[in-house]
Design a protein with these regions (language model features):
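Extended, solvent-exposed, turn-rich assembly/linker loops in the middle of proteins
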Residues: 135-206
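Short helix/loop capping segments that flank catalytic or ligand/cofactor-binding pockets
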Residues: 55, 101-102, 188-191, 271-273
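Long, contiguous amphipathic alpha-helices that act as assembly "spine/axial" helices in icosahedral shell
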Residues: 75-136, 171-172, 179, 220, ...
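Sequence/fold signature of self-assembling virion shell proteins
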Residues: 2-12, 24, 39-51, 78, ...
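Intrinsic-disorder-associated interaction segments
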Residues: 8-12, 22-26, 144, 148-155
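Cell-envelope/extracellular anchoring and linker segments
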Residues: 127, 137-143, 153-157, 267-268, ...
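Assembly/oligomerization interface modules of large self-assembling protein complexes
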Residues: 14-87
Length: 286
């Protein structure tokens, strides 16, 4: 059926919606970040010190006397400023391919654009998490999770030590905690009897955004954004924030009779708010 005048605008709106839905389904790490909006190029945020506050001076929190002054407690934060980053990609489709190809070129182009942007953002999120210095620890696994000697494999111990380290820094990893693993380490976990026979282990009823199940109170999220020989524990909606300056947007640039460019972009930044709610396990692979 021939296109009518103005139909390209309708198609553009439809494609923009499709791209946004695709992106929401493909993200693995960004859904774990608290999302806030921004209308400035540079944003300032504050990293919080999680230390439990104690009274300063001669007064104590416990046992305040009649008509006595209250003790003073002071929370501290570190100020950080950074600029938003733009992520984007486009795909050129000839008029002939768009109209006459044996498969849906437009659909495959949209899928490729979305994957490239989502992958880039998720990789940037993981890089920001690993770059944070003041975490609850970066500790080598007792033995690789795929150790050739099966009896040496003990990922449950490594995971529990991570939970312990975060507890000791006043973050309860079992309230919204997430275990981030790459596909290799996920396979190692699923083949480990100490994991799958642990009373806390269960598979996900519905697999979405990389969520594969639970162990030790943590949600297991599988993603290629996690680098080799490494796993990480964070807390969903607490550890970090995704500050969005421009949400996922899409435009069609049409040259009638020649080609159509599908262009998508997003702009934002990752902000690590609670660095002590990060724990990294290294040496997970032999």
């Amino acid at each position: 059926m021939a296109d009518q005048v103005g139909q390209i605008d309708i198609r553009g709106e439809n494609i923009s919606s499709i791209v946004t839905v695709f992106a929401q389904k493909k993200f693995k790490l960004r859904p774990l970040l608290r999302s806030v909006s921004s209308n400035r190029l540079t944003e300032t945020y504050y990293k919080e010190d999680p230390t439990i506050l104690t009274a300063s001076g001669t007064r104590n929190i416990k046992g305040i006397g009649r008509l006595s002054e209250f003790p003073s407690v002071q929370r501290s934060w570190t100020k950080v400023s950074s600029e938003h980053i733009k992520y984007g990609a486009e795909s050129l489709i000839s008029m002939e391919d768009l109209r006459l190809n044996a498969f849906n070129v437009q659909s495959r182009a949209i899928n490729g654009i979305v994957e490239s942007i989502v992958n880039s953002i998720d990789i940037a999120i993981y890089a920001a998490l690993t770059a944070e210095a003041n975490t609850s620890g970066t500790v080598a696994a007792g033995n690789p999770w795929d150790d050739s000697t099966g009896t040496n494999q003990n990922p449950i111990n490594d995971i529990l030590r991570g939970i312990q380290a975060m507890d000791e820094n006043n973050y309860d990893a079992q309230e919204g905690g997430v275990l981030l693993v790459n596909p290799h380490d996920y396979a190692s976990l699923m083949q480990n009897s100490k994991v799958i026979n642990n009373p806390s282990f269960k598979t996900a009823d519905i697999v979405s955004n990389g969520r594969m199940g639970q162990v030790a109170g943590l949600t297991i999220v599988k993603t290629t954004s996690v680098v080799d020989d490494e796993a990480m524990i964070i807390i969903n909606q607490l550890t970090a924030t995704w500050q969005s300056a421009v949400g996922f947007e899409t435009a069609l640039i049409d040259k009638p009779g020649i080609s159509t460019i599908i262009r998508s972009w997003e702009m934002g930044q990752i902000q690590i708010i609670h660095p002590k709610s990060i724990y990294t396990i290294t040496n997970t692979e032999e």
